[in-house]
């Protein structure tokens, strides 16, 4: 797929769609064990690292003794606040009044903490859409030079 011009990250996402979900037998239990073993590592390390690396922050701006300049520091904090904190706050601050004024309801088995986790996913999803958009812009620019 990579030779066809599709980015390797998108190739892996497409391949992941073909991972079997409902399998009967011994393979199912071993696959579930592997999934349960790796889930915390993936959820709390790999996915946040992936989102951070694709958020547009260049690690060359970081130094062991601090950050190079105040303008770069402001840029980095702006990106972090906008991509991560801003999406969560926006979703929560927009949804809370609707539930409070009974314009809509949370599902019966949903708490505000669970809803907040969905708000986090909303921020991550937007960041991933920016990543995919940047891949497409790079591909379009490369095709125009041919």
UniProtKB/Swiss-Prot annotation:
InterPro entries the UniProt entry points to: Na/H_antiporter_dom_sf, NhaA
Biological processes annotated in GO: regulation of pH
Organism from which the protein derives: Rickettsia conorii (strain ATCC VR-613 / Malish 7)
PANTHER family hit by this protein: NA(+)_H(+) ANTIPORTER NHAA, SODIUM ION/PROTON ANTIPORTER NHAA-RELATED
Keywords: Cell inner membrane, Cell membrane, Membrane, Transmembrane, Transmembrane helix
Membrane-spanning intervals of the chain: 44-64, 72-92, 115-135
Mode of membrane association: Multi-pass membrane protein
One GO cellular component, as annotated: plasma membrane
Similarity comment: Belongs to the NhaA Na(+)/H(+) (TC 2.A.33) antiporter family.
Main location: membrane
Subcellular location: Cell inner membrane
Superkingdom as given in the UniProt entry: Bacteria
Protein name: Putative Na(+)/H(+) antiporter NhaA homolog
Any GO MF annotation of the entry: sodium:proton antiporter activity
